[in-house]
Amino acid sequence: ANTRSRLRMLTLYYYATINDSIVVGTGNKVEDFGIGFYTKYGDGGVDISPIADLMKSEVFKLSAELGINKEILNAKPTDGLWDDDRSDEDQIGANYDDIEKVMKKIEKGENPDDFDNELKKVFDIYTRHHNANKHKMVEIPICYIPNNLKL
């Protein structure tokens, strides 16, 4: 699936280049900075991420306000990288609404020990994905060479 995502990115950049354009990201705060549900140098390889600071629910509200087609708004979330009908939520193990609830509680400083049993399960899923994908959410580390070692 990562290879498909990276080939998709290459295709998007090809068309952006020949059309003197940019590649616009579709990742939201839950996907990009919550659980890191994207492919590094694949669908995460974009020039601008206009909705990356919006929770998924906020993206839906904005989309409805803009009059986006209901068929699109109600579509099952999928990355389209598999040859079956698995959804994002099937792959993640939790639904986006619950992941967003967990993220909001964490942002408010609430203690996960106080979450109900279902949200505790989602918190565990969120934490597992967040920790495993944290490398995607930080800038590429730079190795600074001391001046006395430079040629």
Each model region followed by its residue ranges:
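ATP/NTP-dependent adenylation/nucleotidyl-transfer catalytic domains that generate, transfer
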Residues: 1-6, 10-22, 26-151
